[in-house]
Amino acid sequence: RDCESDSHKFHGACFSDTNCANVCQTEGFTAGKCVGVQRHCHCTKDC
C-alpha cells in the first residue's frame, strides 16, 4: 500500500520528477513526481 502526500518543502512549479523525488526523500518518502495542472510535487512511500 502506498501513502501519498504533497511535498511540504518543494516550492514553486514542479517540472523535474528527479528534483521532486530528491526533495521527497529528504521528507522521508521514497519517491515523488510532478502531478496536476498546477504541477505540484507529490510524494509517495510504502506504508
Swiss-Prot record:
Organism, scientific name: Triticum kiharae
Recorded family membership: Belongs to the DEFL family.
Cleavable signal peptide: none
Protein's UniProt name: Defensin Tk-AMP-D1.1
Disulfide bonds: 3-47, 14-34, 20-41, 24-43
Domain of life from the UniProt record: Eukaryota
Keywords for this protein: Antimicrobial, Disulfide bond, Fungicide, Plant defense
Pfam family, one: Gamma-thionin
GO BP term, pick one: defense response to fungus
Function: Plant defense peptide.
